[in-house]
Each structure stands twice: as structure tokens, then as C-alpha cells.
């Protein structure tokens, strides 16, 4: 059955440009301007921190030292789906580069709340990302990343099922269910290449505040609803040391240490 997880500790970790994403509430983030994705199967705790017992997914954005230019993506679809992305990659010298990117994504949805007339599953999300990369010497590399994302989406567009006809009615609730989230992830990574080993230090901070509202009676009458709020701050520190030459021609050694501190306040009915 594999390795399971409970509460906010997933069994498979996510990293963005070397920055760990701690909470599962941060996993459904918008991915854009990616350079590559690595999927590592099996336990990865030797070189990575918590939540990597079952594997690891590493996402990498474009490095401004390797890629320069301006990218703009526009998209329009049914139900007034709209998508805008932009990114600028600048290389100021052979040793310093910067990238600045942003996006907006939204759709009106497929269902309408009969009670309020509002779109029951519309959503809007937006965000921006700043990345600074410096390589002052051939041995030292510095990387700073700041990624902010905002989500505001209506949800849970459930309707009554007519067992005789097999048709489902449109949602009809007095409270519009939905989810809102503000999330900021930042990280600073220092890399050093020695003659026989590579050393990496990553310090990260994550801020997350969200609010989920559910109309649990799914009726126009106000019988039952649920509201959950989360407020989270987390910091991590990782050190990794890897040999860059095989010992005895076959053994590649590696080890690392990891520290994290998470403060989470949840306001929810139990």
C-alpha cells in the first residue's frame, strides 16, 4: 500500500527551485514558466527534509543566467476561461541575473447557484515570482526566490439528484461555498563546489493564510455550514554535502541535515 500520511504531513515532498513546500495546503499552487520537473521515487530523506519518505517532486524554473528574454502567454476558452502569463529574464553580467514573472488565471465555471444567481464554481487566481541568481566565482552560487500566490474560488457546487430521471439540479444554497488563500514562499540557497565535494545550504520561510466556507446542508435554508481558517508560518534549514568524485570508483557518498519549525493556528469546528 505504500507510505501513507496524516494531517499536514504528506509522504511525497514538493520542492520549487530547491525550496521545500511544507503544508499540503500549499501543494495545489499554480505552476508556470517551468524549465524541468524531476520525479524521484522512493525514500529521499538522505538529501532532503521531512515528507520525502515516499518520494520527491522537484520543480525548476528557468535560470536567468542560462535563458534571457521576455515570455508572454495569453489564453481564452469556454466559460470565459482566461489566462495571462508574463516573464522577463535578464542577465546583467556573467555573474548576476534576475527573473520576474506573474500570472492571472480565471474562469466563470459551469454551474450557477439558483438561490443567488452567482456562478457556483468560478475562480480567480494571481501571483508573482522574483528570482535572483548570482555566481560570483566558479565555486560559489547564490539563489534567492520569492513566490506569492492568491486564490479566490467558489466551490462545492452540489445539486440534488433525481433518481427517477437521473438528472442533477443546479446548486441552490443560501451560502456560497468557497476557498480563499494568500501564500508566500521565500528561500535563499548558497552552493559551494570544492575539489572533492559539493555543499548546499537552503533557508526558507513560508506564510499561508486561508479561509474555507462550506454550506453543508446544500439547501436554500440556513441549517448547517462550516467555516475553517488557517494561519501558518514555517521556517526550514537544510544542509547537504555530496561527494563529486566516486570513492573507489563506485561509491558516491552523501549526507545532509534538516531543521524545520512550523506554527499553525486552525480555527475550525470539531
Which residues does each predicted region cover?
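Short, flexible loop segments at the rims of nucleotide/cofactor-binding pockets, characterized by
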Residues: 15-17, 77, 176-178
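Short beta-turn/strand-loop junction motif enriched in small, turn-promoting residues
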Residues: 3, 43-45, 244
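Non-cytosolic beta-sheet module surface loops
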Residues: 4, 76-78, 205
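Outer-membrane beta-barrel translocator/receptor signature
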Residues: 10-11, 23, 32-35, 41, ...
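Outer-membrane beta-barrel domain signature, strongest for Gram-negative TonB-dependent receptors
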Residues: 95, 117, 121-264
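Extracytoplasmic beta-strand/coil segments of soluble accessory domains associated
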Residues: 1-19, 35
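Short, intrinsically disordered, charge-balanced linker/junction segments flanking boundaries
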Residues: 265-270
